[in-house]
């Protein structure tokens, strides 16, 4: 069908929803005046609201067009297995592994020198970051 028909259907549905809301507000004010506040909405207002909502949703679904498939195979056809979970933005090269996996003789000599001078320890920390 023509897109203008679905837009018209949505317009009619929204108008019916607005009319149902106005009718509900009028009914509530009438119930306050008659001091019968514990009664519920009449069935015709409830049915009009539900029908208008269904008509509006039906029109909106037809205006939206074709939906995409939920199956991911159509989007993954042109990707290789290596690039599937490859996120280079998460690579970190400045980490503590360089200090942890240093040869043991360099670690022992740095520990002895660190005990001798506190200032050299601070400088050595910055040197390890520059390497």
Swiss-Prot record:
A Pfam family it matches: MMgT
Subcellular location as annotated: Endoplasmic reticulum membrane; Golgi apparatus membrane; Early endosome membrane
GO molecular function annotations of the record: cobalt ion transmembrane transporter activity; ferrous iron transmembrane transporter activity; inorganic cation transmembrane transporter activity; magnesium ion transmembrane transporter activity; membrane insertase activity
Keywords, alphabetical: Endoplasmic reticulum, Endosome, Golgi apparatus, Magnesium, Membrane, Phosphoprotein, Transmembrane, Transmembrane helix, Transport
Lumenal side of membrane: 23-43
Tissues in which the protein is found: Abundant in heart muscle and kidney with lower levels in liver and brain and very little expression in intestine or colon. In kidney, highest levels in distal convoluted tubule.
Bilayer topology: Multi-pass membrane protein
Biological process according to GO: cobalt ion transport; copper ion transport; iron ion transport; magnesium ion transport; monoatomic cation transport; protein insertion into ER membrane by stop-transfer membrane-anchor sequence; tail-anchored membrane protein insertion into ER membrane
Record has Transmembrane as a keyword: yes
Transmembrane region(s): 4-22, 44-63
Phosphoserine PTM positions: 120
Topological domains annotated Cytoplasmic: 1-3, 64-131
Annotated family: Belongs to the membrane magnesium transporter (TC 1.A.67) family.
Subunit structure: Component of the ER membrane protein complex (EMC).
Identification of the protein by name: ER membrane protein complex subunit 5
